[in-house]
Structures are given as structure tokens and as C-alpha cells.
């Protein structure tokens, strides 16, 4: 614990909490100040001036990062017949129907993404209390309720991320790993920023992005100048 605190203090000394860093500076600092002994995740956080209680100010969606996430997602698909075969051929890790419902209700959660064909949502709906709180419930807005299961599986395996504003209007997203080249992290960051900018609700008032941060697992938040993105 003492060693971790020492590393954290060393990281804090290199970061000026009053400064807005350019995206290139912020990414370089995030990599430099990472002290985790594993390939830490790199994440961004957007504090948005929105009121998520209003239906037209809820922000939620999905995108495929240009350089992936560095993470291999375990994909589960609820489908039957030909669609089940398509999912398997596309590389889905688990494909099934009621058998998977029983398994999940029994406590099994060894998957990262859940996809379903529209006709299976009545079955998947029985898992609302399990999948909902974990942000795993399939949703048309994130492309996880679809007839094109092959595309959904391939995107989930190839760097697709989902995002959603929480009650405080904060959106967090994974943009890669510390081991990524800096330019690839910058490219991913800029791609996500473009999505956030376009997601601005028409009814949002005042400054939309109040602050933007980048951090690594166990790392320190670094404030980024949105204008550099």
C-alpha cells in the first residue's frame, strides 16, 4: 500500500491539476504516469451539462473505435435457427435461448456483451434484473438488438464500445490500453469526442462539455482541453 501511495504521489507531481492539457500532452502524461504492473486500461470521462431526467437529453449509444480497445470481449447471443448459426459463424462465444436464461439466473456471468434478435427479447426480458444493473441488457440504441447478428458480433469483437450518461451527466468510455502507441490512443480519443459532440441535445443550455478527463486504471485524472480534440 505504501509503495502504491509513493507511485501515486510521484504521478501527482507530474500533473498540474489547474492546467488544461492538449489531447497529445494528456495521452503522453497518462502513459508516463501509469504505475500499474499490468496493461492498464485508458479511459475518458465527459462531464456534460445535461439533465438526464429529460427524455430528450439522455445520451446513449455505441461506436467502433478506429484502433479497437485492446480488450477481447466475450459475446453472448440470444438467437434461434439460422440466426443462431450466423452468430456462431461470426465468432460468438455463447449462443442459445432458454438454456442461457437458466444459466444466467443461476449466477453465471462470464460474458461482456449480450446481443439478441428482436424475436428473442421476450425471453431476454426475464433477465432484466440481472442484466439491467450491469448495463448488459440488449438495446436497439447500442446495436445489440438486431437481425444482423453477424455484424453485431464482429463489431463487438473488433473494438465496439457502448456509452451512456449517468444520473450526474457523466459519460465514461474505454479508449484503449497503456500499451497502445500514443497516436492510436489520440485517434481513438478524437473519434469518441466527435461522437460526444454530435450527441449534444438540441435542448441543452449553456456550456455542453464542462470538463473532459483522461485516466488509466489506478491512475490520476488529467484534464483535457476540448478545443484540442
From Swiss-Prot:
Keyword Nucleotide-binding: no
Domain of life: Bacteria
GO cellular component: large ribosomal subunit
One Pfam family named in its UniProt record: Ribosomal_L1
PROSITE patterns xrefs: RIBOSOMAL_L1
Key words, A-Z: Repressor, Ribonucleoprotein, Ribosomal protein, RNA-binding, rRNA-binding, Translation regulation, tRNA-binding
One Gene Ontology term of the molecular function aspect: rRNA binding
UniProt keyword RNA-binding, yes or no: yes
GO biological process: regulation of translation; translation
InterPro entries: Ribosom_uL1_bac-type, Ribosomal_uL1, Ribosomal_uL1-like, Ribosomal_uL1/biogenesis, Ribosomal_uL1_3-a/b-sand, Ribosomal_uL1_CS
UniProt-listed CDD domains: Ribosomal_L1
Family to which this protein belongs: Belongs to the universal ribosomal protein uL1 family.
Reported function: Binds directly to 23S rRNA. The L1 stalk is quite mobile in the ribosome, and is involved in E site tRNA release. Protein L1 is also a translational repressor protein, it controls the translation of the L11 operon by binding to its mRNA.
UniProt-listed HAMAP family: Ribosomal_uL1_B
Quaternary context: Part of the 50S ribosomal subunit.
Protein name: Large ribosomal subunit protein uL1
Organismal lineage: Bacteria, Bacillati, Bacillota, Bacilli, Lactobacillales
Protein encoded by which gene: rplA
Amino acid at each position: 500500500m505504501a509503495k502504491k501511495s509513493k507511485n501515486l504521489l510521484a504521478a501527482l507531481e507530474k500533473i498540474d491539476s489547474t492546467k488544461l492539457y492538449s489531447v497529445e500532452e494528456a495521452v503522453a502524461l497518462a502513459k508516463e504516469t501509469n504505475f500499474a504492473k499490468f496493461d492498464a486500461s485508458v479511459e475518458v470521462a465527459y462531464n456534460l451539462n445535461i439533465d438526464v431526467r429529460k427524455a430528450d437529453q439522455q445520451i446513449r449509444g455505441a461506436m467502433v473505435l478506429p484502433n479497437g480497445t485492446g480488450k477481447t470481449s466475450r459475446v453472448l447471443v440470444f438467437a434461434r435457427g439460422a440466426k443462431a448459426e450466423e452468430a456462431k459463424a461470426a465468432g460468438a462465444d455463447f449462443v442459445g435461448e432458454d438454456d442461457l436464461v437458466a444459466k444466467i439466473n443461476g449466477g453465471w456471468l462470464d460474458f461482456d456483451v449480450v446481443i439478441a434478435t428482436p424475436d428473442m427479447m421476450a425471453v431476454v426480458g426475464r433477465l432484466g434484473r440481472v442484466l439491467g444493473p450491469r448495463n448488459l441488457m440488449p438495446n436497439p440504441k447500442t446495436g445489440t438488438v438486431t437481425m444482423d447478428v453477424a455484424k453485431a458480433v464482429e463489431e463487438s469483437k473488433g473494438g465496439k464500445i457502448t456509452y451512456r450518461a449517468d444520473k450526474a451527466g457523466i459519460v465514461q468510455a474505454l479508449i484503449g490500453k497503456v500499451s497502445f502507441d500514443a497516436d492510436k490512443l489520440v485517434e481513438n480519443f478524437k473519434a469518441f469526442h466527435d461522437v460526444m459532440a454530435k450527441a449534444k441535445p438540441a435542448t441543452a443550455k449553456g456550456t455542453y462539455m464542462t470538463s473532459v478527463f483522461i485516466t488509466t486504471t489506478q491512475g490520476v485524472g488529467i484534464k483535457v482541453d476540448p478545443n484540442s480534440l
